[in-house]
């Protein structure tokens, strides 16, 4: 990693892989992504997209906190702690369907408890994670607590504020800065305790297992891609099977195949076009979330596109498809820049693809499902072909080489 404070390490006894407990925990991610995608079915408006973005980021944050806890704890992980977090996330997933009616409070309360449980797990271990500053700087949780006394738009705005604070902390507080804060805090406590009194023990900086974390992040992207496949299959099973449906189905499958390749074969940590070890973990996690959220939104759009094999795709669905792929490509472009590809190389990689996506969203008002999907395939295929021709020496984490 690029921070001066050690943040990751390789396992001494050989490479770790996801445990049965971690894979069981990921079942909540399967359920949560499926429920969240349903927020975007039909003809979603901007308010639907905004609510989806906030809830997806909250759900992903809960998953990430316990994923990092399992990564650091290894064989010392407390099973019941993970299962309790799993139950809290299951409540969050179950609350999605009625979030606009009477379940928003349940979603917020479950999120608060999941965050509190994760914080307690680190306190019990006597450790903190330099690359995960929100475990020590929990200001972003305050708006969620306050939201319990509000309803509707005000409540969602408070959720968004809390998540914005967390993102700001992740981007702005380095591992070195967090370590200095912890040292200063416990030095102050020692002075306040006075002579002859025992001060609270300072938590130790925990090291993450980098290859194992890369595998876990990649598995989450596979879960999201799997949800996209499920959406298309479910929609196709209820549609009339004809040439137009075959074109939509084949195009959707090829599009997801291209995204799988860009994220897991030509990326690192599930982030497309990212090279291993160029960014600290705290800067890898947010784009991982953005990519996963974009693919899950794309999944909802692909499921809806199947219904328009003989009619123009409505504007909201068209923009959902184009916008989600646009976000994916934009994150890929940032990752390519951070990976040393340079501005000209990055523009060549994602510039034409983004142009196709934006023009399609703005101009393809009469495009039917098959035409729209295959335009998106062309956009993703360009990036895939260029990256294959300009492949750098190192593509991703060792743990993902077989993906």
Language-model features, listed with the residues they occupy:
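Signature aromatic-anchored transmembrane alpha helix within multi-pass, membrane-resident enzymes
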Residues: 373-374
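Short catalytic helix/loop segments, enriched in acidic residues and glycine
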Residues: 50
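Short, flexible active-site-proximal loops enriched in glycine and acidic residues
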Residues: 81
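Transmembrane helix-boundary motif of multi-pass solute transporters/channels
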Residues: 27-47
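Membrane-helix boundary connector in multi-pass membrane proteins
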Residues: 359-370
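Predominantly late transmembrane helices and immediately cytosolic-facing juxtamembrane segments
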Residues: 2-19, 23, 28, 32, ...
């Amino acid at each position: 990693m690029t921070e001066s404070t050690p943040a990751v390490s390789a396992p001494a006894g050989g490479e770790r892989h996801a445990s049965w407990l971690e894979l069981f925990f990921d079942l909540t991610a399967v359920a949560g992504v499926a429920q969240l995608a349903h927020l975007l079915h039909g003809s979603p408006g901007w308010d639907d997209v905004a609510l989806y973005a906030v809830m997806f980021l909250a759900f992903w944050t809960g998953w990430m906190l316990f994923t990092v806890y399992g990564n650091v704890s290894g064989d010392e992980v407390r099973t019941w702690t993970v299962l309790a977090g799993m139950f809290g996330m299951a409540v969050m997933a179950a609350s999605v369907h009625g979030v606009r009616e009477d379940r928003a409070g349940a979603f917020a309360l479950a999120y608060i408890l999941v965050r509190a449980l994760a914080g307690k797990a680190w306190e019990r271990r006597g450790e903190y994670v330099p690359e995960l500053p929100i475990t020590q700087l929990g200001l972003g949780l305050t708006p969620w607590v306050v939201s319990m006394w509000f309803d509707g738009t005000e409540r969602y705005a408070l959720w968004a504020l809390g998540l914005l604070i967390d993102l700001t902390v992740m981007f702005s507080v380095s591992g070195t800065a967090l370590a200095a804060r912890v040292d200063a805090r416990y030095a102050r406590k020692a002075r306040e305790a006075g002579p002859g009194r025992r001060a609270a023990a300072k938590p130790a900086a925990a090291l993450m297992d980098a290859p194992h974390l890369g595998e876990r992040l990649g598995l989450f992207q596979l879960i999201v891609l799997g949800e996209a496949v499920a959406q298309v299959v479910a929609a196709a099973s209820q549609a009339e099977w004809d040439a137009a449906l075959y074109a939509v189905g084949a195009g959707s499958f090829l599009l997801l195949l291209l995204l799988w390749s860009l994220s897991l074969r030509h990326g690192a940590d599930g982030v497309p076009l990212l090279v291993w070890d160029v960014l600290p973990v705290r800067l890898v996690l947010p784009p991982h979330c953005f990519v996963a959220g974009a693919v899950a939104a794309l999944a909802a759009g692909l499921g809806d596109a199947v219904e328009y094999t003989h009619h123009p795709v409505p504007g909201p669905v068209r923009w959902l498809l184009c916008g989600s792929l646009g976000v994916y490509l934009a994150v890929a472009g940032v990752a390519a820049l951070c990976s040393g590809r340079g501005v000209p190389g990055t523009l060549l990689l994602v510039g034409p693809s983004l142009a196709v996506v934006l023009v399609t969203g703005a101009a393809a008002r009469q495009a039917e499902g098959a035409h729209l999907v295959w335009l998106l395939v062309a956009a993703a295929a360009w990036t895939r072909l260029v990256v294959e021709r300009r492949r750098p020496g190192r593509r991703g984490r060792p743990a993902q080489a077989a993906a």
